[in-house]
Amino acid sequence: MPFDMTVFLPLDPDAAFRLITEPERLRRWKTVAARVELRVGGEYRWTIVPGHSAAGTFTEIEPGKRVVLTWGWEGSPDLPPGASTVSITLDAVDGGTTVRLVHDGLTAEQAASHAQGWHHFLGRLVTLGVEGDVGPDEWAAVPDPIDPLASAEAALAIVQRVLRGVTAANAGAPTPCEDFTVTELVAHLLDSIARIGTALGVPEPAAPSSAAAASVPAEVRIADAAQKTLEALRLRGLAGTVDLGPGGLPASTAANILNLEFLVHAWDLATATGQQLEVAPALSDYILGLARQTITDATRGNGSFHPAIDVAESAASLPRLLAFTGRRNPS
């Protein structure tokens, strides 16, 4: 049973095509993370909401006109990757472009559940096309079910949104991390993600020249590295250890570290750049629990974290998390 929906964007077909195919633009309305090999036979993997990733291959591509891809969900016995087909057709009309999406190969029950999703995300696409920004996706705020990998994906969505506010004007601003400017903190975050990724077998990112690095937005650099690392960690699983540090590091601890890197540094960067941080209490409470499993006297002693700051247990979970990591004035 097919699902069929058409929306209008006040954009030309080429701009609309970029919104539905390029990872940087997909992250603004549809995905938390996206891997795209845009060629016929090329694969894609889109983390739609934390803990739930769609995957498949591209079967038709006409830039500015049409894209067809197989569709399914990782880990789903009922609709695995490749089990259905999504066709998106773009037509130039007065004032913009119509975007028609047809999802074939679904049962009636699957069509009903996907209709809810497509209405949600195509609505976000329209808002993005009209207003230029659609805001954070409430569906990505708290994973269901929640686990250390899904919470890391939710925290990644938060830091990516903050990173879009990093500009040349605020790149040199100081951050709550001592001795780190915004630019230096972004580099630190990238290095932390890459070190865990390398331990998982992800190729180490090439070291670009300063000029080349400056030309790539901070959000793109972090998002690309994080997508590869999180996909590799999800594929590997959280049992056992990874080759990181003397004697190895428990894979579960690596996941915990990513949670802290994403969410705590999102607060650091938001504070430094004057942005408002939006975090669901259930997410910050869960990550606080991971922090209590991960941050020890030894990690505080080696300089990774400052001593915890006293804060009332009645305080909200995000200030308690920040205080536990040693952040001053976490409120």
Regions found by a protein language model. Give the residues of each.
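Hydrophobic/aromatic beta-strand elements that line small-molecule binding cavities or substrate pockets
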Residues: V7, A55-E60, S84-D91
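A short, structured loop/turn motif at beta-sheet edges
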Residues: P13-D14, T59-K65, T89-T98
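Beta-strand/loop substructures that line and gate deep hydrophobic ligand-binding cavities in soluble
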Residues: G75-T127, P136-E138
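Terminal, regulation- and interaction-focused segments at domain boundaries
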Residues: M1-D14
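Glycine-rich portal/gate segments that line the openings of hydrophobic small-molecule binding cavities
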Residues: R35-G75
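Extended, alpha-helix-rich binding/interface surfaces that flank or overlap catalytic cores
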Residues: L185
